[in-house]
């Protein structure tokens, strides 16, 4: 199945660009920028990429991001991801970035977004991978701070397609950001939110009913609530699931325990994504392979996941259908 997964056309919809910072790149950029790091080399840094839950992961994640200072850094980070994604036959990526992680360190908003966007444009031109950029608000910070960041984003409406919500979930429910999302909708942004990773089904309800999001990031705890399952299916709300991340952060004790297959069986619009691949041990194809092996997924399941990835995207209907046709052509030509 490895070669089949590698060749399968797919989209990635849950990817934090800061989470693609491989130890080697972190060390290189740190040296380039004169940022002292507590690791003598990439191998030591990789060993330090150890954590037991979401919060301990975030602590390491924010420390690593401290090397990102210049437009070139954000360009290099983004281009490295796009090249990796293209090698795994990702045709379209909807990428999260966390400006508050950088502006809180004195990095200009424009520096962050210009570096990322230049790479996205070059990626489309040179690699043929299309993309959309989603700005995430850090939920452990206040709504007022998030609103200030949203104000900064208004100047870049042509670049930023959507608004999301990430970081520490427990104790920071979606309801906390009601006003921010009202403003985002008013300004014409697409909206998504992380919900139901650490938080339970109620957080998903809040994201749907208070924030009125078009897509739920993670959402695995939806299976606790029958009414919620029916609502998600009826309203065709996609769920961007990240299997390796879920196991690494202890949401599930093992991949065999993951509920992805059960979600598929309930006709939920589930997609497979890598989240923060530099930290969780794999990019999108490794996630596909992990669930395929652990949950004994068949080819028809993999096709469904790939089709879902485009159906759940923010591409036009015409573009979605073109990609879905390519999936079926690929599948038909594989014996």
Swiss-Prot record:
GO MF terms held by the record: adenine deaminase activity; zinc ion binding
Chain ranges passing through the membrane: none
Pfam families per record: A_deaminase (PF00962)
Highest taxon of the lineage: Bacteria
GO cellular component: cytosol
Cofactor, how bound (note): Binds 1 zinc ion per subunit.
Site (Important for catalytic activity): 218
Signal peptide from the UniProt entry: none
Binding site for Zn(2+): 14, 16, 194, 275
Residues that coordinate or bind substrate: 276
Residue runs in coiled coils: none
Catalytic residues identified in the record: 197
Cofactor field: Zn(2+)
GO biological process: adenine catabolic process; hypoxanthine salvage; nucleotide metabolic process
CDD domains (UniProt xref): ADA (cd01320)
Keywords: Hydrolase, Metal-binding, Nucleotide metabolism, Zinc
NCBIfam families per the UniProt record, alphabetical: aden_deam, PRK09358.1-6
Function comment: Catalyzes the hydrolytic deamination of adenine to hypoxanthine. Plays an important role in the purine salvage pathway and in nitrogen catabolism.
Family per similarity comment: Belongs to the metallo-dependent hydrolases superfamily. Adenosine and AMP deaminases family. Adenine deaminase type 2 subfamily.
Protein name: Adenine deaminase
Organism from which the protein derives: Chlorobium phaeobacteroides (strain BS1)
Native organism taxonomy: Bacteria, Pseudomonadati, Chlorobiota, Chlorobiia, Chlorobiales
């Amino acid at each position: 199945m490895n070669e089949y997964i590698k060749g399968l056309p797919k989209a990635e919809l849950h990817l934090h660009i800061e989470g693609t910072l491989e130890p080697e790149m972190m060390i290189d950029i740190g040296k380039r920028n004169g940022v002292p790091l507590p690791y003598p080399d990439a191998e030591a840094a990789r060993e330090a990429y150890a954590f037991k839950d979401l919060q301990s992961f975030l602590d390491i994640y924010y420390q690593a991001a401290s090397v990102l200072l210049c437009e070139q850094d954000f360009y290099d980070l983004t281009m490295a991801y796009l090249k990796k994604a293209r090698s795994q036959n990702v045709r379209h990526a909807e990428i999260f970035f966390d400006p508050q992680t950088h502006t809180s360190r004195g990095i200009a908003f424009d520096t962050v977004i210009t570096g990322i966007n230049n790479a996205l444009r070059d990626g489309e031109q040179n690699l043929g991978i299309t993309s959309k950029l989603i700005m995430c608000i850090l939920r452990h910070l206040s709504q007022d701070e998030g609103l200030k960041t949203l104000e900064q984003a208004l100047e870049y409406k042509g670049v930023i397609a959507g608004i999301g919500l990430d970081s520490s979930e427990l104790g920071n429910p979606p309801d906390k950001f009601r006003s921010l999302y009202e403003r985002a909708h008013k300004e014409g942004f697409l909206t998504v939110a992380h919900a139901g990773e650490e938080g339970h089904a109620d957080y998903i309800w809040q994201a749907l009913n208070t924030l009125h999001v078009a897509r739920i990031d993670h959402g695995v705890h939806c299976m606790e609530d029958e009414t919620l399952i029916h609502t998600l299916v009826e309203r065709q709300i996609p769920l961007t699931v990240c299997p390796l991340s879920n196991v690494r952060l202890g949401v599930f004790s093992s991949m065999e325990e993951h509920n992805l297959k059960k979600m598929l069986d309930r006709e939920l619009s589930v997609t497979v994504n890598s989240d923060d691949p530099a930290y969780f041990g794999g990019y999108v194809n490794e996630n596909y392979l992990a669930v395929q092996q652990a949950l004994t997924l068949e080819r028809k399941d993999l096709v469904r996941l790939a089709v879902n990835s485009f159906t759940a995207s923010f591409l036009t209907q015409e573009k979605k259908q073109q990609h879905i046709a390519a999936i079926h052509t690929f599948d038909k030509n594989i014996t």
